[in-house]
Each structure stands twice: as structure tokens, then as C-alpha cells.
Amino acid sequence: MVRRVFLLAATALLAACAQAPAAPEGTLSTKDLHWLNTVSFGADQASIARLKAVGRQRYLEEQLKQPVADPPELAGMIAALPIATQDGPTRFAALRAARQRVNALPDGDEKQQARESLNKDGREVVLDASRRHLLRALYSPSQLREQMTWFWLNHFNVYANKGQVRWMLPEYEERAIRPHVFGRFRDLVMATVTAPAMLDYLDNAQSAANRVNENYARELMELHTLGVSGGASGSRYTQQDVQELARVLTGVGLNLRGEPPKLNPQRAALYRADGLFEFNPARHDFGGKTLLGVRIPSGGAQAGFAEVEQAVAVLSRDPATARFISRKLAEYFVADSPPPALVDRMVATFTRTDGDIGAVLTTMFLAPEFDRVLASGSRKFKDPMVFVVSSMRLAYDGRQVTNLRPVVNWLNQLGEPLYGHVAPDGYPSSEGAWASSGQMVRRFEIARAIGSGPAGLFAGDDGKPTARRGFPVANSRMFYDTIERTLGPSTRAALAQAESQAEWNTVLLSSPEWMQR
């Protein structure tokens, strides 16, 4: 059967798609379906019904106004995760105590086992953070918020296996990213500047007036705000600007001690702390600085952490930042090479609204240039996250899985594990990064795993089923109302030859049309 399904899927993958037939009266148009697949991680019956009822503009407004809080059923699932029971300081207090116990043990097997147990606890924190992220991507009605959370996690990337980052991941996504995905870009940047995971990952926690570390300053300018100097965003900055920003950021670090530092009384009032984050004035360079031609005062009310806030405002309001962020959003949602006129519209909105992300998204999703892209049949190629989540949302629409470990493993196999990108640039979103023959073979295998049965998705930690499993049925009423007409003749012919539901599911989820939004 495996060989037969592979041949059917390969036939569809190698064939060119014919123009989709018109939508039957009363159903969602093909353009609207592709629009919805872009705004969400993948259409389901509920989102299709809502878009049909209210139209694009109202649907988008509702998505942008969805509360940050999860709906009750989803909130209950997330509350059951172990990471929900501890905040950062509590987790690190327990970690300090555990490390002290391990260090007190004599060298030998017991000490080694205790270390391995502690490492396992750290891996479980990462797994729980991944589960929480995937639960929301799969089941939250706030699909645009979840997509933007994924987008900004990539943009402000941290790597779980660097330093202490794994222990800080839960708060990074929950406090630094999710609350700000539709807000002012400046506030989002500021939240990441004070995020312990970011400060540990990019080494700013080690930076002090007498030993400045430029790593975070460089990435904050090049990857998070302005773009590469001299690049497409039009940014122009020098190594001197990087050094000045690094001086501004001295003292921005971590407090993993569990108690505040002892400070000179003259500087004590400048100390700030929030959870594991601290601004320690004893480590800050109070000399005058100039960033991108803007003078940053060295004394009075503007000294200390106020310098950091001013620097973030300077970076966030620079014209290069407006273009860099607008183009990156358009590259993720619209096309690898988005229409220049669309990017210009987004830049104008970003500038006019002082970086209002929600307003920029509204401009993008409702722009005539985007509508023309949809009408042309050109669609974004799915990265592994979108491929896996959209496949799950179709195959198990309305059914709650209890074990997300297989989904986590599928993303690992496809090369896009959550919190697993080593470099600070995050995962790419272009087709060229994800369309290799090896990637396609792995996608076929995962399509078969999703389409052939529950694949452990309804099992508990002991491997035993915890709920009525149900078989995935991708050819639902939603398929016939919306998806079928988007398929080319070769894919439809391959589906007609399928000899079982599992084979049919696998062919659909392996088809060239399904690889695009």
C-alpha cells in the first residue's frame, strides 16, 4: 500500500494544476478560501462559515479584536500543562535548589543520574511550551493571533538549547510575544529587550560597562529593526552605531540569584526588576552616546534604563524599520517577492500609525495588490509549521487530540522544531528553503501518518488511548464545498484511484495544491 500511495501522490506532485473551476453559488469563493488560508493556519468548518457570513473586512476586524485570553476549553487544556503552575522566578528557585543538591552529591553514578534527571526536566519545559503553542495553533479561534505569535517568535528568535534559555521559554512567548502581536512595534521590541530568554540567548546578560558585549546590539539592529545596513530596507548605520547601542544596553540583564544586588545609594533608585529581568545601574555605562545621529543624554531623568527606552524608540521609528518589517510580513503572508506597491502601502501605514502592527496587517490583507495575487493563482508555499497544522486542522476538524508529541516530532523531522533554530535569524519562509526533494519525501511520510489513523494522537503518556480516537476523514462536506475545486485534474484523478480512506487522505495531503496556502 505504501508504494501505491507514494506513486499516486508522486503523480499529482509532478503534474501542473489546471485553472480552478468557479465556486458554486452560496459557497466560499476560491479567492476567499485562499485568503482565509492565509489569515489562518488553515481553514476549518467554523472559520469558513464565519467568513461566508461576514466577509473579509469584518472577519479581519474580528480576528484583530480577539482577546489575548484563550477560550475556556482551550484555557483548561493549557492550564493542565506543568509549565502553567510556575512563573520564571519560582521555576529558577526550584532549579537553584535542585542544582545545589546535585552539586553536593559525591562524584559517581548517583550524581550523573541526578544531572540527567535535571536535563530531562529542562527538555520537558521545552516540550510543554511546544505543546502549548501547538494547542493554540490547532484550536484557537484567534487564528491570526496565533500566526503572528509564530511569525514574531521567528523574527525575535531564541534557541532553547543555548545557556538557560529552555527554562525561560514559557514566559518569553507568553509575556514578551503574544500580548504584543497586534500592538505597537516599539512595545513589542521593548518587551523582547527585557525578556530574560533573549538576554541570555544573545549574551547581553554578560554585558557591563567595563566589558561590553556587542552581540545583542548588532542583532537588534540588523535582524529585529533596521535590517542589514545598506540592504533592501535602506538602512544606513555603522559599526560605531552598534557600539553605541551596546553601551546603551549595558546593565540590561538577568537576576538569577533570587535577591536584588547591593547598590551604591546614589544609583539604587535606577534599579529595575521584573521577574528574572533586571536593569542593574552598577553595570551600566553612564557616558554620553549618539545612536543614528540622535544624542542620548547621560544624566538626569534620561539616565539609566530611560536610555534603553529612547534607543528602542529611535530604532522603531526609523524609516528603514518600517520597510524592513513591512516587507518581511508581506514575504511571509503574500509572496516570496511581494508586489512593491503593496510593501509601499504597508510602509506608509506603519509610518502614519507609529508602528501599529494591526493597522499594517489590515492594509496588507485588504490591499488590491494582495487580491490580485490571490486572483493570479500564485500562493505561498507552506513552511513545515503551516503544512502540519493545516493538515491536522483538516483531518481532525472538531476533534481534540490528547497527545501532541507526534506533532512535535513531525516538525522536528521536517527541520522546523519549535525553539530549535540555532542562529538568531529564525526560520526562512521562502519556498526555496522548504521545497527540496528530501523535504517532499518527509512530507509524504507525515501526510501518510496523519491520514492513515490517529498515530498516537489520542494516547496518554503511557501510550494507551485516553479518548475515542476516530479516523481522519479529509473528504468532508467542507472538502467538497471548498477544497475540491482548487485541485488540478491529476490530483483529482489520483484521489479517484484511492482504494481506502487512508489512501485518499494521504494523496490529498501530499498533493501539490495542499503544499500551498
Q: Where in this protein do the model-derived segments appear?
A:
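C-terminal motif of bacterial Sec signal peptides marking the signal peptidase cleavage site
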Residues: 14-16
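N-terminal export leaders
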Residues: 1-7, 36
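Flexible, low-complexity segments enriched for small/polar residues
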Residues: 20-28, 33-47, 79-82, 318, ...
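N-terminal accessory alpha/beta regions
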Residues: 45-155, 159-171, 176-178, 267
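Short, low-structural-confidence N-terminal segments
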Residues: 7, 18-21
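Amphipathic alpha-helical interaction segments
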Residues: 71, 141, 145, 159-163, ...
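A general structural motif at alpha-helix termini
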Residues: 10, 52-55, 192, 364-365, ...
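Active-site substrate-binding loop specific to GH73 endo-beta-N-acetylglucosaminidase modules
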Residues: 109-115, 129-130, 165-404
